[in-house]
């Protein structure tokens, strides 16, 4: 991994392209992306025009917005996270991980505070870093499991997808425990980080991504075993019970390579993307409605002003019925402001 200094990022910020458009205080969409060899944060408005870009030192992954700031985290394992000005894309602060740890790719904000997942370099035990609006560390507390990935917040606390993978930061894509992986959904208290609940997933099923709404919490997973033996990849937490949700008719874990890439709520429906199967699902857990839609390399999903947006590694982004073709290769996730 690369060592990143504040000076390096200040130089990078001078290379950023900043452009404002009349009538828009903040961009509509923020996403990590790639253009040639460059890794960027891309800020778009509703019709796909670029408002600004920010040059990153490596591949970015998760983002969050709060008031006038945006936070971006590098893809795991990462030794950097950044606070950017949401309107202009200018760099405000660099956040290093705690000593002996790396960031695991996701961040969530609540009022003036933000929470980043991180893990120990040895053993991958999970922690949550609590920071203020300028990147100052408020606290660090256990995540309740190994390898925390996506975090979401509601009035019950911080929900954490502890993926269960033990890795080495020098060999990040080698899972050291592929046959003994233990993943869980945990909930910690926002104020003091006290662990409230831990709900286990089936062995070797890695919980990766979460979405929360008044209809409950949805979780998307990746299976580490033989695809033909995969348990359900999509789960629904209703109250205190975690329930599996089957895929649409004609879809199997084999057809999506046992991997769901992102998840979101759209009204009463759960949207789950399967980039390796070139498809996304619309599922209503209350009525058992389930339907598959095809889209090449679709992964990012968000809801903006009540409308569903998706993005792909092929450079497509927008509402499914009005996708815009761009010059960027979008990463797995984006946020709709």
Model-derived features: positions:
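Short, conserved, GDST-rich strand-edge loop motifs in beta-rich repeat architectures
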Residues: 117-122, 161-181, 221-231
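Beta-propeller blade signature
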Residues: 43, 127-133, 178-190, 232-239
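A short beta-strand motif characteristic of beta-propeller blades
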Residues: 49-54, 90-97, 136-141, 194-200, ...
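Blade-loop segments of beta-propeller domains
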Residues: 54-109, 117-118
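N-terminal secretory signal peptides and thylakoid transit peptides that target proteins
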Residues: 1-17
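Structural motif
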Residues: 36-41, 79-82, 123-127, 170, ...
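Repeated scaffold domains used in trafficking and secretory/extracellular systems
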Residues: 58-65, 102-108, 146-152, 205-210, ...
């Amino acid at each position: 991994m690369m060592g990143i200094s504040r000076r390096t990022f200040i130089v990078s910020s001078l290379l950023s392209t900043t452009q404002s458009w009349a009538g828009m205080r903040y961009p509509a969409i923020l996403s990590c992306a790639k253009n040639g060899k460059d890794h960027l944060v891309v800020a778009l408005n509703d019709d796909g025009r670029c408002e600004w870009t920010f040059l990153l030192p490596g591949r970015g992954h998760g983002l969050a917005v709060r008031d006038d700031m945006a936070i971006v985290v590098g893809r795991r394992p990462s030794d950097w996270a950044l606070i950017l000005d949401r309107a202009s894309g200018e760099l405000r602060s660099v956040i290093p991980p705690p000593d002996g740890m790396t960031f695991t790719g996701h961040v969530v904000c609540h009022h003036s505070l933000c929470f980043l997942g991180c893990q120990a370099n040895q053993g991958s035990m999970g922690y949550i870093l609590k920071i203020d609006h300028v990147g100052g560390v408020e606290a660090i507390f256990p995540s309740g499991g190994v390898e925390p990935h996506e975090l979401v917040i509601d009035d019950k606390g911080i929900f954490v997808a502890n993926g269960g993978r033990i890795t080495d930061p020098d060999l990040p894509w080698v899972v050291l425990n592929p046959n003994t992986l233990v993943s869980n959904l945990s909930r910690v208290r926002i104020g003091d980080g006290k662990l409230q609940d831990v709900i286990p997933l089936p062995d070797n099923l890695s919980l990766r991504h979460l979405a929360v709404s008044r209809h409950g919490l949805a979780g998307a997973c990746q299976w580490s075993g033989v695809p033909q033996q995969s348990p359900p990849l999509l789960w629904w937490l209703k109250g205190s019970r975690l329930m599996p949700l089957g895929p649409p008719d004609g879809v199997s874990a084999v057809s999506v390579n046992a991997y769901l890439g992102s998840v979101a709520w759209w009204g009463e429906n759960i949207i789950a993307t399967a980039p390796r199967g070139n498809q996304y699902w619309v599922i209503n857990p209350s009525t058992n409605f389930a339907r598959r839609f095809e889209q090449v390399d679709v992964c990012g999903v968000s809801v903006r002003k009540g409308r569903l947006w998706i993005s792909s590694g092929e450079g497509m982004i927008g509402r499914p019925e009005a996708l815009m073709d761009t010059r960027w290769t979008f990463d797995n996730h984006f946020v709709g402001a």
